[in-house]
Amino acid sequence: MIPNMNYQNLKESYLFYNIAQKTKAYLEAHPGAHLYRMGIGDVSLPLCDAVIQKLHEAVEDQAHKTTFHGYMPECGDTELRTTIAAYYQKRGVKLSHEEVFVSSGASDELGDILDLFGKEKTVLIMEPAYPAYVDANVIAGNTIIHIPAGEENGFVPVPDPDIAADVIYICSPNNPTGAVFDREALQAWVDYANKMNAIILFDAAYEAFIEEDDIPHSIFEIPEARTCAIEICSLSKTAGFTGTRCGYTVIPKELFRGGMSLNQMWVRNRTTKTNGVSYLIQKGASAVFTEEGQRQIREGIQIYKKNGKIGRASCRERV
């Protein structure tokens, strides 16, 4: 048996695992110390009341023969998929529920989605970046082109027409810089991707943190993106689902490469590789998109943003 030799090209350990091990060792050596954890973006507030209520209802459903649910649809419950599509409609993005795929979170999807692209692809990653982008492509054996996203370009790179790529990662608001891509910046990347026959993987995990009306929450607010983009989103930061695990992926029906529908390819992938996100989790996730759920999660997000401002000010005082 020949193993996947690409694993030997990975760093010794995943960044956040390494940070966790160092944190554990430090706290064991300094039991009285209090650390502000600024590694992996975990949350500290509990799930909002609307979600908790739905989770309780789902548990009760599972206790009775008439309301018990077994395997869920591999691509997600139709009701939740429709609810998420309606959420996009509020931003002027029209989606069919069949273009929405419920997942167990963005991290899983960011790795699994590479199944659609075959081997030895050229991938653009804007640095600094979420480490999983790099590691997933190293494992897949892809060629990675790192492009800087720093002060010199306002943390928002523009396409280089001399570089040909198959896959482009865009995260907005960006992890870790916080930079956002305005409509003009996204349009430039969409035009580039369509010209190059490339695919944009748009990571929208932090879209709920956007407050400005003129900043796109979704790449599909750029109409031409339907022929070149896949959007991956998570409820981890939106609604504190880091330990509950739920997200969603949007693949338009117009997205074709090599004569094949990537939407239908993903249906085939999910029906092979998953048995669906659990009934309990999807029931809880449905509450996030209700009027009350939206109000409650926004309250939590404001607390996190306030804490971020305090942390930033404290760091500046010590520079």
Question: Could you say what each language-model-derived stretch is?
Answer:
Residues 34, 122, 143, 166, ...:
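Proline-centered loop/turn at the N-terminus of a beta-strand
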